Amino acid sequence: MILTSNVKLMPGSKVEAVIQISKEFVKAKYNEILKDYSSRLKVKGFRTGRVPFSIIEGKYSDNIRALAIENLIHKSLEEFFESAIYKPLSYAVPKILDEKLEINFDKDFEFTFVYESYPEFEISDISNFKVEIPEVVISDSDIEDELKLLQFENSIIVEDNGSVKVGSIVRVDFVELDDSLNEILATKRQDFVLTVGESDDYYGFGYDIIGMKKDEEKIVEKNYGSDYKFSELANTSKRLKIGVKDIKRRDIPELDDAFAKDVKDSLNTLEDLRDYVRENMLRVVQEKTNSLKLSKLLSGIAEKVNIDVPSSMFEAELKNVINEFSHQNKINITQLQNSSTGLEGVNDVFKENVLNKLKSKLVFQKMVDNDSSEVTELDLENELIKQAQNLKMAPQDVKKFYKERNLFGLLKDEIKRQKVKEKILQDLEEIKLEKVSFRDFVNYKTGE
C-alpha cells in the first residue's frame, strides 16, 4: 500500500514521517467506496445498486473523497507502525500536519504526520560502576523491637472495666460548647474511636480523658497555641463536652515458648523465634540492599545519558504517581486534581523526582531490551512452581490461570526482567558506607 515513507527524529522523542501512496492504489480505494455507495444508495428513478457512478459522484463526491482519505490514512498508519523503526507510544495519538488533504488522481497521495516514540539512547559500559551502600547492623534491641511488633500483631482487643489510660482504645461522643454551655450541633461527633496516646485526634483531647470510666461525661477546656497542628484551631480556645461510651484494651500475649509456637508451628522455643526473626530481618536487609543498589545504578546511569522523555510519557507517569498517591492516602482523585496538588499545581521538585524515576525505568528497560538471554520453558515452569508454593495452589491451577487470561507473554517478560536484574546485581560492585541501624535502613527511601 505504502509507496515510500521517510522519517526524521525531532526534539522531545518526536518522529516526523512522510507517507506516499501510489495514485493507482488511491484510485482503487476511491472506486471501492464508490461501489459501496452504489450498492446501498436509493435514488428515485433507479433501482438500488443501479445508480450510475456519475450521478453518485455529482452528489456525494466530497463525502466519498473524505471517506477515502480517512481510510487511506488509517490503513497506511497501521502498515507503517507494524514495521516502524521508532515505535510509537501506545497512549499518544499521531497528529496529521497537513491542514487540508485532497485526492488528485494524477498524483500520488502524500501526507505528513508526527508521533511520539519511545526515547532513543545508548547505555555505555557499566562494568566499572560502583554504588555506595550503608552497612546495616542488626542489634539485639532491633530483634526485641521486632518481637514486640509480633506481639502487637498477635494481640486481641478485649473489654476493659477499668478507667481510661494510655493505650486504651476508647469510643467517645464529643461536641463543642458555646459560652452558655449550649451544644454547637455542627461540631457533634458520635462513636469516635481513638487510642489514647497514639491517635492524632483533631481537638487533641486524648490525654484529657485519662482516668474517666465508661458512661462518664466531662467538660474539657482546651487552649491551642500558635503552632498547633491544625491551623484553624491555632490561637483559639474550645470548650468540649466528652462522653466515654466504651473502653477496650489490647491484650498482648506473653513472650514465651508458647508464643513462639503460635507464630510458627515449627518453632519450639523463644530462642527459635529470635533466630527466625533475625533470619527474616537479614532477608529484608538483602532485599532492601538489592533495591537500593539497583536504584542507585539506574539513577547514576540516567544522569549521564541524554534521555529525551516525550511529554505524553511524562504526563502519563505523573498521573500514575498522583493516582497512586491518592489511593494510598485515601484522597479522592477529583478533589486532588482540583486542589493545588493537581497536575497543574504539582511543584517543580515533585515533577523533577517523577521525571528522574521515569528515566531510571527507561534505563532498566533498555538494559532488558539489550540483553540477549531468553526465557526458557524451564524458567517458566520454575516460576509457576514458585508461585504455586507461595499461593498454596497446585501448579496446574496457576498455569491454567495464566493460560485462560492469555498472560504468559507478560509472565515471560517479568521473568526476563528478574533475570536481568539478578545479572546486574551479581556484577555490581558496592562500597560500604557508615553503619546504620536496621530500622533506619528499612525506612530509607530507595527512590524506586
Swiss-Prot record:
<dbReference type="GO" id="GO:0051301">
    <property type="term" value="P:cell division"/>
</dbReference>
<dbReference type="InterPro" id="IPR046357">
    <property type="entry name" value="PPIase_dom_sf"/>
</dbReference>
<dbReference type="Pfam" id="PF05698">
    <property type="entry name" value="Trigger_C"/>
</dbReference>
<keyword id="KW-0963">Cytoplasm</keyword>
<dbReference type="GO" id="GO:0006457">
    <property type="term" value="P:protein folding"/>
</dbReference>
<dbReference type="GO" id="GO:0015031">
    <property type="term" value="P:protein transport"/>
</dbReference>
<dbReference type="GO" id="GO:0003755">
    <property type="term" value="F:peptidyl-prolyl cis-trans isomerase activity"/>
</dbReference>
<comment type="similarity">
    <text>Belongs to the FKBP-type PPIase family. Tig subfamily.</text>
</comment>
<dbReference type="GO" id="GO:0005737">
    <property type="term" value="C:cytoplasm"/>
</dbReference>
<dbReference type="InterPro" id="IPR027304">
    <property type="entry name" value="Trigger_fact/SurA_dom_sf"/>
</dbReference>
<keyword id="KW-0131">Cell cycle</keyword>
<protein>
    <recommendedName>
        <fullName>Trigger factor</fullName>
        <ecNumber>5.2.1.8</ecNumber>
    </recommendedName>
</protein>
<dbReference type="Pfam" id="PF05697">
    <property type="entry name" value="Trigger_N"/>
</dbReference>
<feature type="domain" description="PPIase FKBP-type">
    <location>
        <begin position="167"/>
        <end position="253"/>
    </location>
</feature>
<keyword id="KW-0413">Isomerase</keyword>
<keyword id="KW-0132">Cell division</keyword>
<dbReference type="InterPro" id="IPR008880">
    <property type="entry name" value="Trigger_fac_C"/>
</dbReference>
<dbReference type="InterPro" id="IPR005215">
    <property type="entry name" value="Trig_fac"/>
</dbReference>
<keyword id="KW-0143">Chaperone</keyword>
<keyword id="KW-0697">Rotamase</keyword>
<dbReference type="InterPro" id="IPR037041">
    <property type="entry name" value="Trigger_fac_C_sf"/>
</dbReference>
<dbReference type="InterPro" id="IPR036611">
    <property type="entry name" value="Trigger_fac_ribosome-bd_sf"/>
</dbReference>
<dbReference type="InterPro" id="IPR008881">
    <property type="entry name" value="Trigger_fac_ribosome-bd_bac"/>
</dbReference>
<comment type="function">
    <text>Involved in protein export. Acts as a chaperone by maintaining the newly synthesized protein in an open conformation. Functions as a peptidyl-prolyl cis-trans isomerase.</text>
</comment>
